[in-house]
Amino acid sequence: MAGEFRWQAGRPATAQVGGWVLAHCQQRFLQDDNGLLFPREWLKRQELPLLAEHGVGHWQGEPVYVLELDEPIELPGMAWAPLRQFMLHGDFDQFCMLGYASQIGIWARHNRFCGNCGTRMQAQDHERVMQCPQCGLHQYPRLSPSMIVLVTRGDEVLLARSPRFVPGVYSTLAGFVEAGESVEQCVVREVREEVGVEVANLEYIGSQNWPFPHSLMLGFHAEYVSGEIVPQEDEIEDAQWFSLDALPPLPAQRSIARHLIDLYLARRSGAAEPVLPG
């Protein structure tokens, strides 16, 4: 976080009065000309399709809550903005706040009823958990660990693109950790599945919260060992070796994918190493 700690995650009690509130639905936030934070009591007086309310932390010392709405209704003078645009542009502290609020909102939406007996779940005061009053099932906010890796071969990097990417952009390889495997095993497996090559000498670089919708990206560098590139059908549109002096359009600066690439470039050139945002 930034040095002034403008945003701090937490659990301010919903029973207390006042504070700021964010309105969230489908990974979008309500905003007007003054921004995304609204006076809490005022916004709650509007006719909103409210599913849940949770305290999410403090912004500049003031409590912040998120209202999870059933649908993104229209309100005069307001519009809905996607979370991803705040990742790419603007204040990074604000993005951290929105990312956390989005994850809590989605968790609240998906756990309104017990998956075991169907009883309505209840939020608990002592920790961030939804509990079933009937059978006692606990549901904590979901976190999905994913690996992301830059595969290198000297002055070349292996980059790929998914059909879902912005046209022309190539990125590092990524995939979810499966049950029963370590993150390192996931790296080797995903690289083999997505592009058909073998890697070794894995180096853990760092992690980044990725609230789309609830991933934790664990970044690695890996060295190429053997194999020819064979893109995975339906997952990888194209994959190539790129020279460091002839790279294609790359992911956004704030992403861990871009950090892995920039870090390798810095190490090969002897330049100062970049710092991973967050």
Swiss-Prot record:
A motif (Nudix box) lies at residues 175-196. The keyword Metal-binding applies. Divalent metal cations. Mg(2+) or Mn(2+). Binds 1 zinc ion per subunit. Residues 141-265 form the Nudix hydrolase domain. It catalyses: a 5'-end NAD(+)-phospho-ribonucleoside in mRNA + H2O = a 5'-end phospho-adenosine-phospho-ribonucleoside in mRNA + beta-nicotinamide D-ribonucleotide + 2 H(+); NAD(+) + H2O = beta-nicotinamide D-ribonucleotide + AMP + 2 H(+); NADH + H2O = reduced beta-nicotinamide D-ribonucleotide + AMP + 2 H(+). Its EC number is 3.6.1.-, 3.6.1.22. A divalent metal cation 2 binds at E190. Substrate binds at R84, E127, Y140, Q208, N209, W210, P211, F212, P213, H214, S215, A257. The keyword Transmembrane does not apply. Pfam families: NUDIX, NUDIX-like, Zn_ribbon_NUD. A divalent metal cation 1 binds at A174, E194, E235. InterPro entries: NAD-cap_RNA_hydrolase_NudC, NADH_PPase-like_N, NudC-like_C, NUDIX_hydrolase-like_dom_sf, NUDIX_hydrolase_CS, NUDIX_hydrolase_dom, RNA_Hydrolase_NudC, Znr_NADH_PPase. GO terms for molecular function: hydrolase activity; magnesium ion binding; manganese ion binding; NAD+ diphosphatase activity; NADH pyrophosphatase activity; RNA NAD-cap (NMN-forming) hydrolase activity; zinc ion binding. Coiled coil: none annotated. Keywords: Hydrolase, Magnesium, Manganese, Metal-binding, NAD, Zinc. Zn(2+) binds at C114, C117, C132, C135. It comes from the Bacteria. GO terms for biological process: NAD catabolic process; NADH metabolic process; NADP catabolic process. Its cofactor is Mg(2+); Mn(2+); Zn(2+). It is an enzyme of class 3 (hydrolase). Homodimer. NCBIfam families: PRK00241.1. Belongs to the Nudix hydrolase family. NudC subfamily. mRNA decapping enzyme that specifically removes the nicotinamide adenine dinucleotide (NAD) cap from a subset of mRNAs by hydrolyzing the diphosphate linkage to produce nicotinamide mononucleotide (NMN) and 5' monophosphate mRNA. The NAD-cap is present at the 5'-end of some mRNAs and stabilizes RNA against 5'-processing. Has preference for mRNAs with a 5'-end purine. Catalyzes the hydrolysis of a broad range of dinucleotide pyrophosphates. This is NAD-capped RNA hydrolase NudC. The gene is nudC.
